[in-house]
C-alpha cells in the first residue's frame, strides 16, 4: 500500500498512532509475530531478492512495524495462537499502477491507458514497485493480502475499480492461487482542497464497487475513523483489527 499502510506503530512526525505506547510496551507478549519490511526499490527490471530480514515483535522493534500490519497480525495471533508472519511492501504516495505490470494495465479494459501509464516518479511509474518490491517476495507461501492504497489515484478515480480488479488477478497469479483472500481498507474521510474535493469519495465508491468483481475479498470500513485535517488517521488499531475480522 501507500503511506497509511507504511505508517509505523510509533507514528509519523506530529502524527501519532493512538495506543502506540501500550502497543510497544506489550509487544513482548506476542513473540510469535514477525514482520518482514520490504525495502523501497523502484526497479526497471524484475528482481528476485531484496536486502531485508525478519524482525520479531519486541518493545524495541515494534515501533517501526507497519501499524495496520502489526495490529492485524496481533489480532490473528490472539485468535489462532500460532506464529504469524507479515510481509509488508509499502511506499508513501504510490499509485496502484506502480504495483502492477504494464501488461496487466494494458489488459485492463475500458480505462484511460495513457493516464494509467503517465506516472513520472519512482513510486508512480507502472511496474517499478511490482518489479522491485513484489517479485522479490512472491516465492513465499502466503495466506492472503491486505491492501491500503488509493489516495494517490484520485486523478483517475474513474478507472480505480477496474485497476484494482486487475491488480488482484495479477497478484493471485504471481502466488499461484486464484482464490487467495484480498482484504482492503476503505480510504478514510479527509478534506482535500481545490478540484480534488470530490475525488476521494469517488475513489471510495470505486473501492466498494470492486467488491462485486473480486471473489474472496472484503473491505474494512473506516468512515468513523478519519480525520478531516490529517491524511494519516491515528486509529490504526481499529483498521488492522477490522481487516483481521474479515480474515
For each feature predicted by the language model, list its residue ranges.
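Cell-envelope and extracellular/periplasmic
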Residues: 2-247
Amino acid at each position: 500500500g501507500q503511506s497509511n499502510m507504511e505508517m509505523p506503530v510509533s507514528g509519523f512526525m506530529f502524527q501519532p498512532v493512538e495506543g502506540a505506547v501500550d502497543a510497544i510496551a506489550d509487544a513482548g507478549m506476542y513473540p510469535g509475530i514477525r514482520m518482514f519490511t520490504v525495502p523501497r526499490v523502484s526497479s526497471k527490471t524484475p528482481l528476485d531478492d531484496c536486502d531485508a530480514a525478519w524482525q520479531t515483535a519486541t518493545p524495541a522493534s515494534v515501533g517501526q512495524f507497519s501499524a495496520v500490519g502489526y495490529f492485524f497480525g496481533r489480532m490473528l495471533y490472539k485468535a489462532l495462537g500460532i506464529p504469524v508472519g507479515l510481509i509488508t511492501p509499502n511506499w508513501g504516495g504510490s499509485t496502484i499502477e506502480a504495483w502492477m505490470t504494464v501488461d496487466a494495465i494494458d489488459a485492463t479494459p475500458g480505462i484511460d491507458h495513457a493516464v494509467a501509464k503517465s506516472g513520472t516518479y519512482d513510486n508512480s511509474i507502472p511496474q517499478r514497485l511490482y518489479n522491485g518490491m513484489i517479485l522479490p517476495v512472491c516465492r513465499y507461501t502466503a495466506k492472503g493480502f491486505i491492501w491500503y492504497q488509493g489516495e494517490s489515484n484520485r486523478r483517475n478515480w474513474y478507472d480505480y475499480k477496474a485497476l484494482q480488479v486487475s491488480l488482484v488477478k495479477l497478484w493471485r497469479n504471481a502466488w499461484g492461487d486464484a482464490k487467495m483472500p484480498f482484504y482492503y481498507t476503505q480510504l478514510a474521510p479527509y478534506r482535500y482542497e481545490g478540484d480534488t474535493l470530490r475525488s476521494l469519495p469517488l475513489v471510495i465508491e470505486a473501492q466498494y464497487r470492486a467488491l462485486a468483481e473480486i471473489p474472496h475479498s472484503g473491505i474494512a470500513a473506516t468512515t468513523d475513523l478519519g480525520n478531516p485535517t490529517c491524511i494519516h488517521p491515528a486509529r490504526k488499531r481499529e483498521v488492522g483489527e477490522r481487516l483481521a475480522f474479515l480474515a
